[in-house]
């Protein structure tokens, strides 16, 4: 049960603007929009990178994307620990500096693919990861009553923010080359990220929203699990396996969209005078954002596991359908955004469920550990998928078949394994 005094504690501590949880949520969404391009715009840089580094196999260029995801995810348990312990502002400033350096140095100083491994992969990846975990965990802390919606809105900034910028970035690449575009966008994104860092705060100790009523369809623990305690629970490993598998198909599509379009013989098509890949990627970004908000809100009402099972099954079907549309650019433009609609929800559902199952106090560190599954998925989705496609004359059909199976298995795990595990354990806490 909450009180008005509890609700006013945030205003008393931070003032009426910074202490408003909706302002906190909005600042987190803006920060996510800033870092979204580092993941979703990579496919726009690949044609220029292939031209600049013509003697380098595409799988080695795709490794830039894989390394970005790895460094975006694997350092997060440590970053999450420091965020929970020392607060969000300093870590956000560090992340902002790293993304600024990543693209700025990549555009001005990179002369080899290895240089981009360091700049785009390590620097930008680590910075984006710090900002990502900071904002998602902050949303979970500020919205215990609407975790699915808050996590979905925050993650929507990451999934859909690129919809605002992919076409402008594509135009920048066309006019400035990939180096100039990477430099100018790196500077702008770094400045905006710093501005959000100056706003973001964790809620004061003891704060709860006014008149909070726990959602009936969502089971939430009353305990606060440390990372070590969380990793002693079977449900954590089930969630990790599910996150890993469902991530694979979406990441593969995100990082290789240009090559997938070429393998489907639709790359040279245009729509309304716009090249098909940036146009489709923009629409897909919108659907990706919609997915995180809509599925997150649905999960608040109907439960996380039921929502996961439905969405993952839909994703598996859509991923399989992608293998059947060779030579059909209209089908590509229609189907691809729906792939993202059925995939983007994982970042809302798993972050919200981490707070439900293991408590909000250590949400940054706990979700940071779970989020490393995305790093493992990136190995299969980036370099791995490109290598397998090369074995089949550039076709991504086999990687997509594997991803579809992963999605269906994850849907089954959500209903038949994760749901009973969580309910049994939390019922035993009473």
For every predicted segment, state its role.
Residues 49, 130-143, 151, 345-358:
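Intracellular juxtamembrane helix-capping segments at the cytosolic ends
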């Amino acid at each position: 049960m909450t009180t008005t005094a509890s609700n006013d504690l945030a205003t008393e501590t931070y003032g009426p603007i910074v202490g408003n949880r909706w302002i906190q949520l909005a600042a987190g969404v803006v920060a996510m929009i800033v870092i979204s391009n580092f993941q979703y715009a990579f496919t726009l840089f690949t044609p220029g990178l292939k031209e600049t580094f013509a003697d380098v196999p595409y799988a080695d260029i795709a490794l830039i994307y894989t390394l970005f995801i790895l460094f975006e995810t694997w350092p997060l348990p440590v970053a999450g620990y420091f965020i929970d312990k020392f607060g969000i502002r300093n870590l956000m400033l560090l992340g902002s500096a790293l993304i600024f350096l990543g693209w700025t140095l990549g555009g001005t100083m990179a002369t080899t693919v290895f240089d981009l491994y360091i700049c785009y992969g390590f620097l930008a990846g680590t910075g984006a990861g710090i900002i990502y975990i900071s904002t998602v965990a902050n949303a979970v802390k500020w919205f215990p009553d609407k975790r699915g919606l808050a996590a979905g809105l925050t993650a929507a900034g990451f999934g859909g923010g690129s919809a605002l910028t992919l076409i402008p970035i594509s135009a920048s690449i066309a006019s400035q080359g990939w180096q100039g575009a990477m430099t100018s966008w790196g500077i702008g994104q770094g400045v905006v990220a710093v501005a959000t860092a100056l706003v973001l705060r964790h809620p004061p100790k003891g704060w709860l929203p006014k008149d909070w009523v726990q959602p009936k369809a969502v089971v939430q623990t009353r305990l606060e699990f440390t990372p070590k305690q969380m990793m002693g629970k079977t449900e954590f490993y089930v969630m990790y396996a599910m996150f890993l598998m469902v991530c694979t198909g979406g990441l593969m599509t995100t990082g290789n969209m240009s090559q997938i379009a070429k393998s489907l013989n639709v790359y040279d098509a245009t729509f309304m005078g716009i090249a098909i890949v940036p146009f489709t990627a923009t629409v897909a970004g919108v659907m990706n954002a919609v997915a995180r908000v809509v599925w997150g809100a649905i999960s608040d009402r109907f439960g996380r596991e039921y929502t996961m099972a439905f969405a993952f099954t839909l994703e598996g079907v859509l991923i399989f359908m992608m293998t059947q549309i060779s030579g059909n650019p209209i089908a590509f433009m229609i189907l691809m955004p729906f792939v993202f609609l059925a995939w983007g929800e994982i970042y809302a559902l798993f972050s919200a469920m981490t707070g439900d199952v293991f408590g909000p106090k250590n949400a940054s560190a706990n979700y940071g550990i779970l989020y490393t599954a995305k790093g493992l998925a990136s190995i299969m989705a980036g370099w791995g998928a490109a290598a397998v496609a090369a074995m089949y004359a550039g076709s991504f059909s086999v990687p997509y078949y594997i991803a579809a199976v992963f999605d269906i298995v994850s849907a089954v795990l959500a209903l038949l394994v994760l749901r009973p595990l969580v309910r049994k354990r939390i019922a035993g806490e009473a």
